[in-house]
Amino acid sequence: MNIVTGQLNAHGKKFAIVVSRFNEFITNKLISGAEDILKRHSVADEDISVYWVPGAFEIPAVAKKIAENGKDNGVICLGCVIRGATPHFDYISAEVSKGVASIALQSNVPVIFGVLTTDSIEQAVERAGTKAGNKGSDAAMSAIEMVNLYSAI
């Protein structure tokens, strides 16, 4: 049996991080977590590009352009959508999820979903570096593994 896995060494690899400015008090923590993991796994500072977009809805469009340009080995999408009193949360969460998934399926580079969709600010804070870890860190680890897996396929 041949088992293929992605290694967790990212030396010489380039990563793009697309991050939403909306709920920036959370997304700043997600991006810090992602950058920390990338650097711990040998990604040079100059090989990390950060693209700020206004909100989560804009993430897929920018991620698609980056994935198509061929400059980066992986794209990490980070954002935070917190449920409010209107259905807006449902629409945004669904569309950003579908958009990132669609790009990931059509792209030759891994596109990783690291967008929080939470029912409360407390849940978002927990997932941005407190009780529930840092989902930005998790997304970066997934990106490293998937970049290496894509190379092995």
Curated annotation (Swiss-Prot):
Domain of life: Bacteria
Position of the signal peptide: none
Chemical reaction(s) catalysed: (2S)-2-hydroxy-3-oxobutyl phosphate + 5-amino-6-(D-ribitylamino)uracil = 6,7-dimethyl-8-(1-D-ribityl)lumazine + phosphate + 2 H2O + H(+)
Pfam families xrefs: DMRL_synthase
UniProt: 5-amino-6-(D-ribitylamino)uracil binding residues: F22, A56, F57, E58, C80, V81, I82, F113
Record pathway: Cofactor biosynthesis; riboflavin biosynthesis; riboflavin from 2-hydroxy-3-oxobutyl phosphate and 5-amino-6-(D-ribitylamino)uracil: step 1/2
Binding sites annotated in the UniProt record for (2S)-2-hydroxy-3-oxobutyl phosphate: A85, T86, R127
CDD domains: Lumazine_synthase-I
Matches recorded under Gene3D superfamilies: Lumazine/riboflavin synthase
Entry EC no(s): 2.5.1.78
Annotated family: Belongs to the DMRL synthase family.
Purpose: Catalyzes the formation of 6,7-dimethyl-8-ribityllumazine by condensation of 5-amino-6-(D-ribitylamino)uracil with 3,4-dihydroxy-2-butanone 4-phosphate. This is the penultimate step in the biosynthesis of riboflavin.
The protein, known as: 6,7-dimethyl-8-ribityllumazine synthase
Organism per entry: Endomicrobium trichonymphae
